[in-house]
From Swiss-Prot:
Zn(2+) binds at residues 117, 121, 127. Keywords: Cytoplasm, Endonuclease, Hydrolase, Metal-binding, Nuclease, Ribosome biogenesis, rRNA processing, Zinc. It is an enzyme of class 3 (hydrolase). The gene is ybeY. This is Endoribonuclease YbeY. Single strand-specific metallo-endoribonuclease involved in late-stage 70S ribosome quality control and in maturation of the 3' terminus of the 16S rRNA.
Protein backbone atom coordinates (compact mmCIF):
# COMPACT_ATOMS: atom_id res chain seq x y z
CA UNK A 1 0.00 0.00 0.00
CA UNK A 2 1.22 3.50 -0.69
CA UNK A 3 1.11 6.83 1.04
CA UNK A 4 -1.91 9.10 0.61
CA UNK A 5 -0.96 12.73 0.03
CA UNK A 6 -3.36 15.65 -0.31
CA UNK A 7 -2.23 19.11 -1.43
CA UNK A 8 -4.67 22.02 -1.27
CA UNK A 9 -4.79 25.79 -1.26
CA UNK A 10 -6.67 28.10 1.08
CA UNK A 11 -7.12 30.58 -1.78
CA UNK A 12 -6.69 30.39 -5.54
CA UNK A 13 -3.55 28.34 -6.20
CA UNK A 14 -0.67 30.30 -7.70
CA UNK A 15 0.48 29.02 -11.07
CA UNK A 16 3.97 28.62 -9.68
CA UNK A 17 3.05 25.66 -7.48
CA UNK A 18 2.11 22.42 -9.19
CA UNK A 19 0.30 20.16 -6.70
CA UNK A 20 1.43 17.04 -8.59
CA UNK A 21 5.09 18.03 -8.28
CA UNK A 22 4.57 18.74 -4.59
CA UNK A 23 2.86 15.37 -4.06
CA UNK A 24 5.72 13.62 -5.90
CA UNK A 25 8.26 15.41 -3.73
CA UNK A 26 6.46 14.45 -0.52
CA UNK A 27 6.21 10.87 -1.77
CA UNK A 28 9.98 10.75 -2.35
CA UNK A 29 10.72 12.14 1.11
CA UNK A 30 8.38 9.64 2.80
CA UNK A 31 9.95 6.79 0.81
CA UNK A 32 13.48 7.88 1.74
CA UNK A 33 12.46 8.07 5.41
CA UNK A 34 10.89 4.60 5.10
CA UNK A 35 7.48 5.96 6.13
CA UNK A 36 4.79 3.73 4.67
CA UNK A 37 0.99 3.88 4.54
CA UNK A 38 0.97 7.48 5.72
CA UNK A 39 -1.97 9.82 5.20
CA UNK A 40 -0.70 13.38 5.08
CA UNK A 41 -2.15 16.69 3.95
CA UNK A 42 -0.48 19.94 2.99
CA UNK A 43 -2.36 23.24 2.90
CA UNK A 44 -0.89 26.36 1.33
CA UNK A 45 -2.24 29.63 2.76
CA UNK A 46 -1.34 33.25 3.45
CA UNK A 47 0.15 34.87 6.56
CA UNK A 48 -3.23 35.94 7.93
CA UNK A 49 -4.56 32.38 7.88
CA UNK A 50 -1.47 30.80 9.45
CA UNK A 51 -1.35 33.58 12.07
CA UNK A 52 -4.86 32.62 13.17
CA UNK A 53 -3.80 28.98 13.48
CA UNK A 54 -0.61 29.95 15.33
CA UNK A 55 -2.64 32.01 17.81
CA UNK A 56 -5.30 29.34 18.26
CA UNK A 57 -2.99 26.34 18.72
CA UNK A 58 0.28 27.82 19.99
CA UNK A 59 -0.89 31.06 21.62
CA UNK A 60 1.53 33.01 19.40
CA UNK A 61 -0.14 35.96 17.69
CA UNK A 62 2.13 36.25 14.66
CA UNK A 63 2.51 34.47 11.34
CA UNK A 64 5.01 31.67 10.86
CA UNK A 65 6.28 29.82 7.82
CA UNK A 66 5.16 26.27 8.59
CA UNK A 67 2.96 24.52 11.14
CA UNK A 68 2.55 20.79 11.64
CA UNK A 69 -0.43 19.18 13.31
CA UNK A 70 0.48 15.62 14.26
CA UNK A 71 -2.43 13.20 14.56
CA UNK A 72 -0.53 9.95 14.99
CA UNK A 73 -3.52 7.63 14.71
CA UNK A 74 -3.42 4.16 13.19
CA UNK A 75 -6.50 2.73 11.51
CA UNK A 76 -7.49 -0.05 9.13
CA UNK A 77 -8.57 0.75 5.60
CA UNK A 78 -11.26 -1.13 3.63
CA UNK A 79 -8.76 -3.84 2.68
CA UNK A 80 -7.79 -4.39 6.32
CA UNK A 81 -4.38 -2.74 5.85
CA UNK A 82 -2.96 -0.68 8.69
CA UNK A 83 -2.62 2.99 7.79
CA UNK A 84 -1.15 5.90 9.73
CA UNK A 85 -2.97 9.23 9.91
CA UNK A 86 0.20 11.30 10.19
CA UNK A 87 -1.36 14.75 10.20
CA UNK A 88 -1.41 18.09 8.46
CA UNK A 89 1.20 20.58 7.34
CA UNK A 90 0.31 24.23 6.72
CA UNK A 91 2.69 26.51 4.79
CA UNK A 92 2.32 30.26 4.36
CA UNK A 93 3.13 31.35 0.81
CA UNK A 94 3.79 34.87 2.13
CA UNK A 95 6.38 33.58 4.59
CA UNK A 96 7.83 31.26 1.94
CA UNK A 97 8.61 34.26 -0.29
CA UNK A 98 9.89 36.30 2.65
CA UNK A 99 12.19 33.49 3.84
CA UNK A 100 13.66 32.94 0.38
CA UNK A 101 14.54 36.62 0.12
CA UNK A 102 15.63 36.99 3.76
CA UNK A 103 17.95 33.96 3.67
CA UNK A 104 19.03 34.56 0.07
CA UNK A 105 17.97 31.12 -1.16
CA UNK A 106 16.05 29.97 -4.18
CA UNK A 107 12.30 29.82 -3.52
CA UNK A 108 12.23 26.21 -4.76
CA UNK A 109 14.87 25.29 -2.16
CA UNK A 110 12.96 27.06 0.60
CA UNK A 111 9.69 25.36 -0.33
CA UNK A 112 11.35 21.94 -0.12
CA UNK A 113 12.87 22.94 3.24
CA UNK A 114 9.48 23.88 4.70
CA UNK A 115 7.86 20.67 3.45
CA UNK A 116 10.66 18.48 4.85
CA UNK A 117 10.52 20.43 8.12
CA UNK A 118 6.81 19.71 8.44
CA UNK A 119 7.26 16.02 7.63
CA UNK A 120 10.00 15.65 10.24
CA UNK A 121 7.72 17.19 12.87
CA UNK A 122 4.93 14.78 11.90
CA UNK A 123 7.45 11.97 12.33
CA UNK A 124 8.07 13.02 15.94
CA UNK A 125 11.22 15.12 15.56
CA UNK A 126 11.48 18.48 17.28
CA UNK A 127 13.90 21.33 17.98
CA UNK A 128 14.10 23.83 20.83
CA UNK A 129 15.21 26.75 18.66
CA UNK A 130 16.22 27.48 15.07
CA UNK A 131 19.98 27.30 15.53
CA UNK A 132 21.72 25.15 12.91
CA UNK A 133 23.21 22.97 15.68
CA UNK A 134 19.81 21.44 16.43
CA UNK A 135 19.84 17.74 15.48
CA UNK A 136 16.54 17.93 13.63
CA UNK A 137 17.70 20.89 11.57
CA UNK A 138 21.02 19.21 10.75
CA UNK A 139 19.16 16.11 9.60
CA UNK A 140 16.75 18.28 7.60
CA UNK A 141 19.61 19.94 5.69
CA UNK A 142 21.33 16.59 5.03
CA UNK A 143 18.07 15.15 3.71
CA UNK A 144 17.47 18.17 1.48
CA UNK A 145 20.79 17.56 -0.31
CA UNK A 146 19.22 14.47 -1.91
CA UNK A 147 16.60 16.63 -3.63
CA UNK A 148 18.86 19.43 -4.82
CA UNK A 149 17.84 19.03 -8.47
CA UNK A 150 14.14 18.37 -7.88
CA UNK A 151 12.01 21.31 -9.03
CA UNK A 152 8.63 21.75 -7.37
CA UNK A 153 8.23 25.52 -7.71
CA UNK A 154 7.95 27.00 -11.19
CA UNK A 155 9.60 30.39 -11.48
Amino acid sequence: MSNSISVSFNDEPPGSIDPVRVENFISEVLKDLNLKNWDISLLFCDDAFIQNLNKQYRDIDSPTDVLSFEQGDEYFDEAGETRFMAGDIVISLDSLSFNAEEFNVDINEELKRLIVHGILHLNGMDHSDNSPEQEMLKFQEELLMQYKNMEIYRV
